Amino acid sequence: MATRFRSTLLVITLFVLIDWVTKLVVLLQYKDLQILTHPTLYTHSWGRFSFSIAPVFNEGAAFGLFSNYKYFLFLLRIFVILGLLAYLFFKKKSIQSTTQTALVLLCAGAIGNVGDIIFYGHIVDFISFNYKQWAFPTFNVADVLISLGTLLLVYKFYFPTKQTEKKR
């Protein structure tokens, strides 16, 4: 196995572990508060803006969408992970660093959420932001990784480097 791919797997593993550890810490804290209907583990407010940590169990995709298709979503996530890993392995020499970083973030986030489904039967979300009456959907570290990876790919598409333009 090539050194570059091995280091890529190491970075993916590190991100997945960070995601899983944060979820485990929240779930262990939540376990003590299960007598409450919807316990909030931590809340902090700055004027009209607030941040809270409270576990929410999500059986769908982003923001709980398509929760009726959880088995299809699970298989789709597995195929996406396998596709990303295959691309990272077979294109390891020609892939640009920005693209590689984006794919690593996407892969780590997907693995983190698939791990939740395997171990808990649902995705564990716990980070929540609110502004006045507006509440952003609850998310987790894996979702942040997926969002950052997606933003990097969009950035790369709209602002290609000279190397990318030559390949087109």
Swiss-Prot record:
It is found in: Cell inner membrane. It is a multi-pass membrane protein. The chain crosses the membrane at residues 8-28, 70-90, 104-124, 134-154. It is an enzyme of class 3 (hydrolase). Keywords: Aspartyl protease, Cell inner membrane, Cell membrane, Hydrolase, Membrane, Protease, Transmembrane, Transmembrane helix. GO terms for cellular component: plasma membrane. The keyword Iron-sulfur does not apply. The active site is at D125, D143. It catalyses: Release of signal peptides from bacterial membrane prolipoproteins. Hydrolyzes -Xaa-Yaa-Zaa-|-(S,diacylglyceryl)Cys-, in which Xaa is hydrophobic (preferably Leu), and Yaa (Ala or Ser) and Zaa (Gly or Ala) have small, neutral side chains. It comes from the Bacteria. Pathway: Protein modification; lipoprotein biosynthesis (signal peptide cleavage). NCBIfam families: lspA (TIGR00077). This protein specifically catalyzes the removal of signal peptides from prolipoproteins. This is Lipoprotein signal peptidase.
